[in-house]
Amino acid sequence: MITIQPEIEILSTESYEDMLRRIEKIGRVCYKSEERIGEGTAEKFIAGIIKRGHESVIEHGSITVKVTCDRGVTHEIVRHRIASYSQESTRYCNYSKDKFGNQITCIDLATGFSYDLNDENDRKKYEVWQKAMEAAEQYYFQMLELGAKPEEARSILPNS
């Protein structure tokens, strides 16, 4: 299991080609296929998502803010559709595959709650959280080993 810091990245375009590349970059987040981005791949990818009816990704042709945060936070903001949202799909992404490093990724609790890891109580809370995340990862992979689909095993993953 790895922990990462929350972050925000504002993406903007200056040309038609840049806009297509940005739509592809954000669209591929949903399928966790960013490694397939290459020279000339954007138009084909966009045609494919349109064919599959995933048109909301096209809305990223205006302005896009990539937010790396807790899944619980995304569940709050996507309910208020004042913009277009695309997020990594735990339904389709199988974290036991090599492209994920065979591990889940969790947003670091200590950062979000400003824990002082030199403080004994904060450190103990953080250690309990870390053990819970590691257990969730273990049971997620166990479900997959038992033949569960990613969309079944995802119910074990942390959401807030």
Residue ranges and their predicted role:
Residues 1-160:
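Family-specific signature for flavin-dependent thymidylate synthase
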